[in-house]
Amino acid sequence: MTKRLWRIIIGAAVLATAVLLSLNNEWLQIALFIISYIIVGGDVVKRAVKNIFKGQVFDENFLMSIATIGAFFIGEYPEGVAVMLFYQVGELFQSYAVGKSRKSIASLMDIRPDYANVKKGDELVKVDPDEVQIGDIIVIKAGEKIPLDGKVIEGSSMIDTSALTGESVPREVEVGSDILSGCININGVITAEVTKEFGESTVSKILDLVENASSKKSNSEQFITKFARYYTPVVVIIAVFLAIIPPLVIDGATFSDWIYRALAFLVVSCPCALVISIPLSFFGGIGGASKKGVLVKGSNYLEALAETEIVVFDKTGTLTKGVFNVQEIHPEGVSKEELLELTAHAESYSNHPISFSLRRAYRKEIDNGRISDIEEISGHGVIATVDGKKVMVGNIKLMKMMDIPYFKGELIGTIVHVAVNNKYIGYIVIADEVKEDSAQAIKELKAANIKQTVMLTGDNKSIGSKVAKELGLDKVYAELLPADKVEKLEELFSQKSKKGKLAFVGDGINDAPVLARADIGIAMGGLGSDAAIEAADVVIMTDEPSKIATTMKISKKTLKIAHQNIVFAIGIKIIVLILSAFGITTMWAAIFADVGVTIIAVLNAFRALNVKNL
């Protein structure tokens, strides 16, 4: 950027000298114009020649080169240099805007750690994070970036997660806490055991995601690419006809006059404003979203969010905290302690949130030697042998499948039924909590003209209905198996318009098929969840559903800016193209129609980055 700025300043100074000084020597004046042209336009002509040899003839470099060299041939030296000078000014604005757009992504790129302090004996050795292995012990001092994912084994501190989440409140870590690469250690010294190699760490996955985001083009960007492909050769052909035909068929018409018009026509026709500002708008939108702790994997997904009509939520871990707590224990023929002990052991190998809550409530160490023959039945529960007894833990479906009589009273919460050797021994009531901002999230989505908000859950109807009523959801589908969720999604697809989109929001853990099937898959709690980052199109780094509405606002703002630029740029260019063809405008007006429109469009695109009040 500095190099280009100096070229503009020096080129402008030489041009001003040639124009303002009344030089007696015409050849010296022409020489100054040529020197000025080489300074500001040499690289453009060079690129045009290179592209011609590559078979890429019709681009903005070609248009600028032909128009300006043509101006020199008909003696319009100041205009020829001015076109290149102002083209470079437009490019300068573009590089500045791209630089600013990249800053939020640069704040993400800043999360890449430069080194890791690896403990080797009594010494600390600074090494590249790529060289650190799983199981190595690293030390993170105050003010340093956490280089790799790990578990704290010594010390405590506050860590700044804002670069990943957009949240300013620091998080406390102590012995046993998981720490994530890319966060900053604020005060204490912590020692951690590395749990993932750098290539698989949170920071690497996020950086890879962001770097590849620009490769997925929105419909608006694809339209501009196709438009430029056909538009540029057409205007070159029109310019050639404009320069040759009128002087041959119109009495008194001169070639110099019509060539001048054709050159002005070429300058105006350059599609820079569109080619630059549209991708820049989406790039700015993606950068703005990252400021809010939301990673969008491509412009196509950002655009699709603006067209969303139906938002479907998974319940557990998305609208609710996913932290289940045992509320009640109701044994039949055994003690409460025995019921909980058998249940915790049977569920010990499951990674379901309910299993965690049962083990947490047991509060004792699980003796794995007592457990064998574990069978997890999806959507039903677990069957395991504990102390030689066949223990069945699950929902109503499991009890029905095993033909075991069970408690059928009305209860609010998740009921875990337990049987031993086909004899019912009681049930445990577990409840989840709704997240603080879930109701606000639904309210904001409805305010953003989302036609339907839907919740899918494997829980029973009473729990599903209670949560849906509390949050103000339009529909709820309960008692669903994982496969049923995809089926329900297919039903919901038929309820949206042809252009409308359906978004599914889940925690990214058990939702991969549904996230993949939706038009836009949104994963919550991406911070620390590899599955969320892998599976979704949009990753919300925190556990806040309200950020979905914020991301949609960013999406709509970005799309509005892109459409404004398309209408503005094409509209101005059509008007000035017609005026140029009729000889009503000069080359200077053509320069404004090209460079001026580009600068205005770039500055407008720049607004996509401003997400402070969204």
Task: State the predicted function of each range.
Residues 12-13, 222-251, 261-282, 563-592:
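Bilayer-spanning, highly hydrophobic alpha-helical transmembrane segments
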Residues 61-65, 164, 260, 273-346, ...:
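Conserved catalytic phosphorylation-site environment of P-type ATPases
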Residues 48, 76, 97, 116, ...:
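Residue-level signature of catalytic and energy-coupling elements of molecular machines
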Residues 388, 420-564, 572:
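Conserved ATP-binding TGD loop and adjacent catalytic N/P-domain core of P-type ATPases
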Residues 49-57, 96-106, 280-299, 606-614:
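Juxtamembrane helix-loop transition segments at the membrane interface in multi-pass membrane proteins
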Residues 19-21, 26, 33-119, 131-138, ...:
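Actuator/coupling domain of P-type ATPases
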Residues 1-10, 231:
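N-terminal membrane topogenic signal
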Residues 141, 326, 330-452, 461, ...:
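P-type ATPase nucleotide-binding
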